[in-house]
Amino acid sequence: MSRYTGPSWKQSRRYGISLSGSGKEIARRNYVPGQHGPNNRSKLSEYGLQLAEKQKLRFSYGLSERQFRNLYIAATKVKEGTVGFNFMTLLEQRLDNVVFRLGLATTRRQARQFVNHGHILVDGKRVDIPSFRVQPGQVISVREKSMKVPAILEAVEATKGRANFVSFDADKLEGTLVRLPERDEINPEINEALIVEFYNKMM
């Protein structure tokens, strides 16, 4: 299954989350596209609930099913902690996500583009792989030739607050993943246990 590249508002409304981060997609119509009103919801089966939760998280990070599943498999191989939380942590360690968390991009999709286009450095070296796993203490910065890219400067200006597990220097356009996040610091609307149940049945 390929990565979804259609309008983000459709998936935002379908799964009740804001993929843009602004919340505008679901502020006015908090029911799925195609429904004739907010009360016309069908009750999901157990499998349907698990699938919906999985899709909600997958679309939040903008991953293909293969990327998402492979990261889940990696989480099952981590010796400490629960599979669900380890999975959430690995998602957060993706370079495109850290770029987003630092406020260098307004969305994860935009962050992925910045990484792909070579605008981002990790410890001073250009990394153009969005799935690169950032470790605590590593410095994420904008390469010198990209420091005046309007979209990056606009994103930094628009960012009002950042997660407690990252630090950012707006003057240098660089930041650090200070530590791995705690569970209550990321995606509180997600029930990762449903995702674990989904993959346990499928694998």
From Swiss-Prot:
InterPro entries: Ribosomal_uS4, Ribosomal_uS4_bac-type, Ribosomal_uS4_CS, Ribosomal_uS4_N, S4_RNA-bd, S4_RNA-bd_sf. Coiled coil: none annotated. One of its GO terms (molecular function) is rRNA binding. It comes from the Bacteria. One of its GO terms (biological process) is ribosomal small subunit biogenesis. Residues 93-156 form the S4 RNA-binding domain. GO terms for cellular component: small ribosomal subunit. Keywords: Ribonucleoprotein, Ribosomal protein, RNA-binding, rRNA-binding. NCBIfam families: PRK05327.1, rpsD_bact. HAMAP family: Ribosomal_uS4_B (MF_01306_B). Part of the 30S ribosomal subunit. Contacts protein S5. The interaction surface between S4 and S5 is involved in control of translational fidelity. Belongs to the universal ribosomal protein uS4 family. One of the primary rRNA binding proteins, it binds directly to 16S rRNA where it nucleates assembly of the body of the 30S subunit. PANTHER family: 30S 40S RIBOSOMAL PROTEIN, SMALL RIBOSOMAL SUBUNIT PROTEIN US4M. This is Small ribosomal subunit protein uS4. The lineage of its organism: Bacteria, Bacillati, Bacillota, Bacilli, Lactobacillales.
